[in-house]
Amino acid sequence: EQLNVSFIGKDSTLQFNMGGKTAGGIAGIKTNWQKVLPQKGVQVEGMVYTQCDYRYPTEYPVATINNYGKGKIAAFFMDMSVAYNQYRNPVFNNLIRNVISALIPDPQVKVTGSDNVHVVLGKKHRRAYLHLINSSGDHFNKNVMAYNELLSTGSLKITYKTTTKPLSVKLQPTGEQINFTYAGNRIEFVVPPVSVHSIV
């Protein structure tokens, strides 16, 4: 009821194509899937395709976002976890990112420049700390038990929402001052490549 979709039949394990232009492409997937039809006013993210071609979409979405109370509610109608662990197709990441952006259009922190960065926001003594953790590596490769080298990220563009202009932005542990701009209750700056872990 809250999702405002109609469920069609029962869920089943099938092989099909899914994605879309906003997801950066179409990816093949074999997984458990529930067909649904969105009602009027429901936002759709991604579609199921009969072929790996934008000309052949079905009427079934990958995910939907619907207004609910003062916020929004979203759902994916297929299990992408196993497929992601096996294929690591960026289409899966993009679909999830797009849904999160629809739910949280103005996040506290935005990081662009790499898909392999985990961000942890902390606050202490009226200061904000952004932990940038390089998460690259063969985490999902069962044949790799350990590795001793990570690929550095590229430079990262970061925007952070704050109601007051900070006195300074520093990169730790080096203490390097980072140039930043402040406009519209957001600061924007660029962080040099992260080898393992950096703090701003």
Residue positions per predicted region:
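A conserved amphipathic helix/loop scaffold
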Residues: 1-200
